[in-house]
């Protein structure tokens, strides 16, 4: 920019001024929410994290994060880095939760028929139920009595996973 000043006698002088406009404002991210995904395993959950929305008064040249390839069950904090064309950087954290809301599967053992030895105090041996879960089975229980009365007794087996989800099957 050239500045010129003229006095009342018509004398003038000029000076040149250089004005440089620089970007010192970092990009911004709005509404970065925690994300929740269903677990498929204890340690190897393949999760596709959606790209975040960022804006800048110039041009964004990179949006990156440090998310692992495979997520463990539980909470992971990832860091996003947004850089604009002027080198301004904004770093923000995002919480990723991998949860287990799926009930385990359980298969009760086969039915058992034994010869009675008394009317009320029959010992019965039976197999154990089989259960599986996407993450981890905590307990497998049943409501079988210690001794069985004469006749049919329904035994309910229950599998509970580490997140408290449960499923039952009868024998």
Model-derived features: where do they sit?
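Proline-threonine-serine-rich low-complexity tracts
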Residues: 1-171
